[in-house]
Amino acid sequence: MMRRTLRVCMTLLCLIPGMGQTCGYDALYPNPFEQSWPGALDVAMATAAAVNDDRVARLPTLTGEAGFARSQAWLQTLKSRFQQAGVRGGVSILLIDSGLWSRLRGKESLLLQLHTAGPHPRDRMMLLSEAALDALLAGTLTIEEALRLGVVALPGEEGRQLQHDLHLALGS
């Protein structure tokens, strides 16, 4: 069972583009050893374990345009929830499965930027898997549970504030 989890994690690592690269939805995969972001492998391994333990639902694999559209819909929903909760932007988000960097920016009116080159230097950061984002938005996983499981990482000094904001936005 552990070998299977390790294989899944290594496969996910190979799909994580680096900063300034195209994402996995573009089907262009440079050297996988240049593609990692600090903490992304930990999130990938935790996600594989959570899926394996039925703590997070396994998602159907979607690639290309269909995968990008699904991720875009999730991120738009997250943006809407931030806005409804009155949470400010300044959040860079990495979906570790595809390597898709996105950004929520603004104060009263939030804007979602997809396919950004990486995190904005002053942004709070959020690393998570598609399965974790789906579960958070569906209400089957709280942000506290996601952090405990390791399927979400909020690195940096602003991580606690972002956790609080996610709690407000997701109602968990």
Predicted segments with their positions:
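Positively charged n-region of N-terminal signal peptides that target proteins for export
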Residues: 1-7
